[in-house]
């Protein structure tokens, strides 16, 4: 009588080698999750920030001030900031009359915003096409929390005008002299800005007085 042959598949243990891989696996499919690449690390910022743009081409003489300001994008990490910054026009590329803002999330760059209402702004000026570096260093100082009174800061705006460009840092409480003077001095040092700069209170600016004076100067 012929010897009966065992046709059952051999187990992995019976042959001392691993079982064959599933033939149904698609080409390129990762079966071992331990080998999958980790998502790139991100570096969260202390605050989220929003870019805003005020397009002069959408303004009309009858429109209320600030009605043409629109939010562009909010970022919360270092990586998101650079992704945005590297893909937007820098001040030297903006058209005359444009205003580009970077404010803490949920603070609108308007005098009427409750957080801005009692504040003011420090302003520097430079020639046309000269503000790109100042603007970048201002942004990095703000989002990187380099100011001793960083909680007092609402945001910053760069304004492109016919003969010059202006950058301003907006703050919350104009009456807090120690905080405002500290911010002004640190800002000048960070930018290595040699000229004097002045602090204007928003309530004073609303009066449109040609004889408007700085509340503080550094």
From Swiss-Prot:
Gene Ontology MF terms in the entry: RNA 7-methylguanosine cap binding; RNA binding; translation initiation factor activity
Region (Disordered): 1-39
Keyword Ligase: no
Binding site for mRNA: 61-66, 93, 111-112, 161-166, 206-210
Keyword RNA-binding assigned: yes
Post-translational modification: According to the redox status, the Cys-116-Cys-154 disulfide bridge may have a role in regulating protein function by affecting its ability to bind capped mRNA. Phosphorylated upon oxygen deprivation.
Compositionally biased spans, kind Acidic residues: 21-30
Annotated stretches, region: EIF4G-binding: 43-46, 53-89, 137-146
Domain of life: Eukaryota
Coiled coil spans: none
Assigned keywords, A-Z: Cytoplasm, Disulfide bond, Initiation factor, Nucleus, Phosphoprotein, Protein biosynthesis, RNA-binding, Translation regulation
GO CC annotation terms, alphabetical: cytoplasm; eukaryotic translation initiation factor 4F complex; nucleus
Intrachain S-S bonds: 116-154
Compartments, as annotated in UniProt: Nucleus; Cytoplasm
Gene Ontology BP terms: defense response to virus; regulation of translation; response to anoxia; response to ethylene; response to jasmonic acid; response to salicylic acid; translational initiation
The family this protein is said to belong to: Belongs to the eukaryotic initiation factor 4E family.
Function as written in the Swiss-Prot or TrEMBL entry: Component of the protein complex eIF4F, which is involved in the recognition of the mRNA cap, ATP-dependent unwinding of 5'-terminal secondary structure and recruitment of mRNA to the ribosome. Recognizes and binds the 7-methylguanosine-containing mRNA cap during an early step in the initiation of protein synthesis and facilitates ribosome binding by inducing the unwinding of the mRNAs secondary structures.
Quaternary organization: EIF4F is a multi-subunit complex, the composition of which varies with external and internal environmental conditions. It is composed of at least EIF4A, EIF4E and EIF4G. EIF4E is also known to interact with other partners. In higher plants two isoforms of EIF4F have been identified, named isoform EIF4F and isoform EIF(iso)4F. Isoform EIF4F has subunits p220 and p26, whereas isoform EIF(iso)4F has subunits p82 and p28.
Name by which UniProt lists this protein: Eukaryotic translation initiation factor 4E-1
Organism in which the protein naturally occurs: Zea mays
